[in-house]
Amino acid sequence: PVDGHSAVVVKFYRPGRWSDAQILEEHAFAAELMAAEVPAVGPLALHGQTLHQHGGFAFSVSPRRGGRRPELDDAEVLEWIGRFLARIHTVGARQPFEHRGAVDIATFAQEPMDWLLAHQMIPLDVQGAWQKACVSAIDLIAGYAALARAGGQNLSETRLIRLHGDCYPGNILWTPTDLPGGGPHFVDLDDARSGPAVQDLWMLLSGDRAQQQNQLGQLVDGYEQFREFDRDELALIEPLRTLRLIHYSAWLARRWDDPA
């Protein structure tokens, strides 16, 4: 057993993606969440350290936590997740990240678009139309100050807090509620960033408009049992979705020949 855990997961960090300071800031955030009794899975401190090196690779060791994807068509499950997201954000709002980035246009749209074009990843027959669509989207999203960092005319009072950052259903594992510690637990905080609270909610929505509105209502019902939710942030859902699509396109392209 490692530090009392019968099974652990060793995570190796892709060289060059995160600095040691950024990784340690993620680990510190996970430790804050666990200290606040939020069911997040963070790295173990071995010999007083959470970040280790071997063969030129940085790695961490975390307890293995099993589970399945949550049933997001269950109102009780959504409310439960909403309550824990509020608690994550309560901790996240205590202080800002110093080293980790934000969910913004520069990181999630401009840089990925420029990279895809520079590396000729977009087929020539659609490149012009694709670039025009991206530029139009970026220009529209730039009107939201919460995502543009500067300028912007709408939502200028939106507060940016520390987030999980990649809160889609695959990063929430559910265990039976009749077992000790049952319910949701949150994994994979390595995309933790600063951003508006709604970033951690919108990726849990699926289905048609009516279904998504119902799911959102249940998430917010749970959320507001612990923390107020700013409904003005709902206007950011489509801009955030667009940023993710552009960013994810570059993420996939960069790993096209990756043996991992």
PLM regions and their residue ranges:
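Active-site acidic catalytic loop and adjacent metal/ATP-binding pocket
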Residues: 1-10, 43, 145-201, 205
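Hydrophobic alpha-helical segments that form the core
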Residues: 108-111, 240-250
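All-alpha amphipathic helical-bundle segments outside canonical DNA-binding/catalytic cores
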Residues: 100, 229-241
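A glycine-centered beta->alpha junction motif in the catalytic cores
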Residues: 15, 58-72, 116-124, 245-259
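Active-site activation/catalytic loop segments of kinase-like enzymes and analogous catalytic loops
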Residues: 197-228, 244-259
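A cross-family kinase active-site recognition segment
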Residues: 71-133, 158-160
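ATP-binding pocket architecture of kinase catalytic cores
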Residues: 3-99
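Activation segment
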Residues: 15, 67, 184, 192-194, ...
